[in-house]
């Protein structure tokens, strides 16, 4: 994939980052080809999450265009539109008005094409790797849980600030992978280091665009805790299989209900 135009648009050295991204993609393919990852997962959840994010953003562009905002919606949608599409503001929207669904909908709402593009690039790169490692039910649970831990830290850090984006969950995936693969010792060292490089890349990008560091930290801590607690042994994974199927169904249902509830507010 040609990453150069994307990084050039951010004022970064596109040629250098193109080389880095190509090298990381090659390393990831080598890791999976050499059998470091177990087989057996269909990887469906990652791409479903990607599709939901893209569809939700497309709906926002259409709604913003219909409201007369034009192309500004594509690159920098205004705050009211972000709130209409589930942006999170703890005070007053959640704590006073009880709009609890925003604790999940914010993670599917993005403040422009660059914001969406970055989060989807990272999800596309690391999501299939983690889903293949731990299975779809655990992956869905992890993704949803870290969206919640990301926004919960924001409650204490900046309760009155509008927050949007999947980066809390993305950092959650990275935090999980670093902790989980670190527990594997030398067998997981290459994958742990791969994820650490992604963490550095994500942090630098977030610093450049002034992203929500509280959400990043909350997601990463939630993911790391998940990675430290999740059983590594086959026996432990089998013992918890039913639990995570139930949790995944609950997570998916909560996400669908939250997005549906947000859509319902458009007609009130």
For each of these PLM feature ranges, what is it?
Residues 2-268:
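A detector for small-residue-rich transmembrane helices and their helix-helix packing motifs
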